[in-house]
């Protein structure tokens, strides 16, 4: 997984230069480590996703995979400027439209 994130770096840097932000929404199958994950090997989150959230601060980090058997389980967690959402089954996010022009001004 780390390698896949590293391969994304050139595009993320380009986005920052052109649009003023690395990315708004990051969608994955697995969760970050210690955020909505479990301790068994199949449901353990990835540490590299925690690094990604700290470094690139997407507005939303959306993951699935972690089944919610109890409706009281936490499904949304705020990590600095990033909202981490367990979208297992379904989850509706209301995201504001952003107008971005070609020279990076919002």
Label each region the model flagged.
Residues 2, 16, 38, 44, ...:
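Context-gated lysine
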Residues 50-56, 60, 68-106:
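Binuclear metal-dependent phosphoesterase catalytic core
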Residues 1-22, 42-50, 106:
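Binuclear metal-dependent hydrolase catalytic cores centered on His/Asp/Glu-rich metal-binding motifs
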Residues 29, 64-65:
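Active-site glycine-centered loops adjacent to acidic/histidine catalytic or metal-binding residues
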Residues 7, 32, 68-70:
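Intrinsic structural disorder/low-complexity segments
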Residues 21-57:
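Active-site-proximal segments of metal-dependent phosphoesterases and phosphodiesterases across multiple
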């Amino acid at each position: 997984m780390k390698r896949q994130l590293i391969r994304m770096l050139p595009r993320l840097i380009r986005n920052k230069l052109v649009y003023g932000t690395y990315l708004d929404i990051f969608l994955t199958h697995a969760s970050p480590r210690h955020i909505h994950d479990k301790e068994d090997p199949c449901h353990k989150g990835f540490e590299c996703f925690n690094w990604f959230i700290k470094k690139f601060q997407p507005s939303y980090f959306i993951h699935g995979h972690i089944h919610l058997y109890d409706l009281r389980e936490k499904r949304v967690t705020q990590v600095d400027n990033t909202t981490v959402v367990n979208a297992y089954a379904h989850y509706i996010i209301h995201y504001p439209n952003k107008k971005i022009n070609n020279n990076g001004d919002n």
